[in-house]
Amino acid sequence: MRLVIATDEKKFFRQFLEILRSIPPLTKLRNRELDILAAMMYYNYLYKDLDDDIRGRVLNSKATKKDVREMLGMSQDVYNNNMSIIRRTGLIEKSGRLADALQVFPGTSYKMEFHFNIEKDVLR
C-alpha cells in the first residue's frame, strides 16, 4: 500500500506521531502530550544543523519552551506536567534530547516503511 500525504513542516510531525500512535510508548500519550512532542520534534528539525548536544540544550532552553507553550496555547504548569509524562516514556531525555526514533529530518518529502513480522496463531 502506498499513501501520499500533503502536509507542511509544522503539521508533518504531528501526523508522523499519529501514524505511530498505536506503537508503544506512544500509546501511553494523550493528545496534548503528542502535541508537545510534535512541537519539540519540529524545533529539533529547525535546529538540525547544530551539534546533537547543543541542539538538546536549545530544545531545553526557556526560550524554546516558551515558544512551544505559546504555539500550543498552554500555561507553564500544564506544559511542565505534560513534559514530565513524556520524559517518563523515555522519548525526551532530561537534557532535552529527543529519542533516536524521533530524530526525524524531512526534506521536501519523507518516506516511512513498515515491516510486520507476523507469527502464526497456534490453535490449541
PLM regions and their residue ranges:
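Positively charged, structured surface patches that bind polyanionic biopolymers
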Residues: M1-K28
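Non-membrane alpha-helical secondary structure
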Residues: I5-F12, R32, N60, V78
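Intrinsic disorder/low-complexity segments enriched in polar/small residues
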Residues: K10, F16-I19, L34, K66, ...
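Alpha-helix C-capping/helix-to-loop hinge sites
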Residues: S22-I23, Y43, M71
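Alpha-helical hairpin
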Residues: K28-L29, M74
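Short helix->loop/beta-hairpin flanking segments within DNA-binding domains
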Residues: L29-A63
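Winged helix-turn-helix DNA-binding recognition segment
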Residues: L50-A101
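Short, cationic-aromatic polyanion-contact patches
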Residues: R97-R124
